[in-house]
Amino acid sequence: MLLWLGHLISHAGDAIYMIALPWLMLELTGSKSLTSFVATSAYLPAVFFGLIAGVIVDRYDRKRIMIISDIARALLVTVIPVAILFDFITPLLIGCVTFLLSSFATFFYPARDSLIPHITNPEELSSANSAITISGQMSHLLGPLFAGVGISIF
């Protein structure tokens, strides 16, 4: 239950920043090219680290990888509002934060997926996987909605 709730919150945050950071870049620069750069930097870590992430997850403590990844992502997300508050937000900072957020996610999700069978009874594995999948889909659906509401307010 705790893993599911954490996943729901984490996944919703991912969906929000996938909308909010490109929007912020567009607002900051007006450049469609730089906005595309931010969107691309969100997907590059899967290409660069996808295969090695699986190996690392198999060799090291999955729970620790998940915790480190989520703490790192939480800290990275705070960089953007702090940079805005102190007026040192730059396109490079937004791109780097986006890349790093996605990099940590590239390690988090395989760790989570491989941990589920170890913390779930075999007869509940299908239900656990279904709950994780459904919450992920709901987050992908609701995250952009929340991002849009947040953007319209600010």
Spans of model-derived segments:
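Alpha-helical transmembrane-bundle signature of multi-pass membrane transport and export proteins
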Residues: 1-154
